Amino acid sequence: MSRVTAIISALIICIIISLSWAVNHYRDNAIAYKAQRDKNARELKLANAAITDMQMRQRDVAAL
């Protein structure tokens, strides 16, 4: 009986270790994805601001 208990305990420990590794892996991926998303959002906002500024300048020049 103690041999079966040892095998079951070892199996449970392996499952816990595997699950913790998977959670850590996907957490790291989520953090990297969020950083990329934030960086791209900042760049897009900057590009949109530049386009708006150019359009305003173009209208001002056309008005002259």
Swiss-Prot record:
Component of the spanin complex that disrupts the host outer membrane and causes cell lysis during virus exit. The spanin complex conducts the final step in host lysis by disrupting the outer membrane after holin and endolysin action have permeabilized the inner membrane and degraded the host peptidoglycans. Its main location: host cell. Belongs to the lambdalikevirus i-spanin family. This is Spanin, inner membrane subunit. Residues 25-64 are periplasmic. GO terms for cellular component: host cell plasma membrane; membrane. It is found in: Host cell inner membrane. InterPro entries: I-spanin. It holds the Pfam family Phage_lysis. It comes from the Viruses. Coiled coil: none annotated. One of its GO terms (biological process) is viral release from host cell by cytolysis. It is a single-pass type II membrane protein. Disulfide bonds: none annotated. Residues 1-3 are cytoplasmic. Keywords: Cytolysis, Disulfide bond, Host cell inner membrane, Host cell lysis by virus, Host cell membrane, Host membrane, Membrane, Signal-anchor, Transmembrane, Transmembrane helix, Viral release from host cell. The chain crosses the membrane at residues 4-24. Homodimer; disulfide-linked. Interacts (via C-terminus) with RZ1 (via C-terminus). Part of the spanin complex which spans the entire periplasmic space. The spanin complex is composed of spanin, inner membrane subunit and spanin, outer membrane subunit.
